[in-house]
Regions:
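Conserved AMP-binding A3 loop
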Residues: 72-98
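Conserved A3 ("GATE") glycine/threonine-rich loop of ANL adenylate-forming enzymes
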Residues: 167, 242-249, 261-269
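Conserved AMP-binding/adenylation subdomain of ANL enzymes
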Residues: 95-114, 121-224, 234, 259
């Protein structure tokens, strides 16, 4: 792609990248998001904070016009045999993906949402759902410090949309059930009734009677509200992608009044 500038997030990746970059004639400048130890003078390495401190006239900078078919990024596939393969995505392919994603919400357009991003941005799923989609809908992106602090960060920022992989939802599902199983028999029975009524509401609305609605409402005050707090106080829905979400997990959250939207696609598209 003949890139002349590279952005590197941390020192660990810098050490890997610089081994190849020192022998690459195209790369002239490297901007790092952490201070790194680089004493050679082969490349110009700049810590991003140093750029912000300079009071230069930003009008000097200009952006070249791009065509839809120009390369926008290269994402390396995971889970394939042999070495990872670099997939070149054009501006057109990313925009088409965004148009399709935004069209899903045509009845309730996304605007000024609050996303929390914690998946690797080197994956096409998070590239779209966690980065480009928020930007395209004038929304905010909050980046989690790390996976261990994810739920602390969720409480801090109260996202309206959370994008994750099935594995996370499976872990939450198991944790909720384990906590319920530690309760007395009455609580366990009430929770099962709550799930059953939620499932009926989701799958068979015709047989969802008025009495069911009343019981479900009362039980939701006991269970649903507490469970929803795991995801903050402003959650609208969850997004699942990067793998298949089992029906069991999906219906579990839907039964608790937590909407999960499922996405799918290939890195190559």
């Amino acid at each position: 792609c003949n890139a002349k500038l590279a952005f590197i997030s941390n020192e660990r990746l810098f050490k890997i990248f610089i081994q190849a970059a020192d022998n690459n004639k195209n790369i002239k400048n490297i901007i790092t998001f952490e201070k790194v130890n680089y004493k050679k003078k082969i490349k110009k390495v700049t810590y991003i904070e140093e750029i912000f401190k300079k009071k230069e006239n930003t009008n000097k900078f200009s952006i070249d016009k791009k065509n839809n078919d120009d390369e926008a990024c290269i994402i390396y596939t995971s889970g394939t045999s042999g070495k990872p393969k670099g997939v070149v995505l054009t501006h057109k392919s990313i925009l088409a993906n965004l148009e399709g994603s935004i069209d899903v919400f045509n009845k309730s357009p996304l605007k000024n949402e609050r996303f929390i991003s914690f998946l690797p941005l080197s994956h096409s799923y998070e590239h779209t759902a966690g980065q480009f989609l928020p930007v395209a809908t004038s929304s905010q992106i909050f980046y989690a410090e790390n996976l261990e602090k994810l739920f602390i960060n969720i409480k801090e920022v109260n996202p309206t949309i959370i994008s994750a992989v099935p594995r996370l939802y499976e872990a939450i599902y198991k944790k909720i059930l384990n906590n319920i199983f530690k309760k007395n028999n009455l609580i366990q029975k009430l929770f099962k009734i709550n799930l059953k009524l939620g499932k009926t509401k989701y799958e068979d609305k015709k047989n969802y009677r008025l009495s069911d609605k009343i019981i479900k409402f009362l039980l939701s005050l006991i269970f649903d509200k507490k469970i929803k707090k795991i995801f903050g106080s402003k959650l609208k829905f969850l997004i699942s992608g990067g793998g298949a979400l089992s029906y069991e997990i999906n219906i579990f959250f839907e039964s608790l009044g937590i909407k999960i939207l499922q996405g799918y696609g290939l890195t190559e598209t």
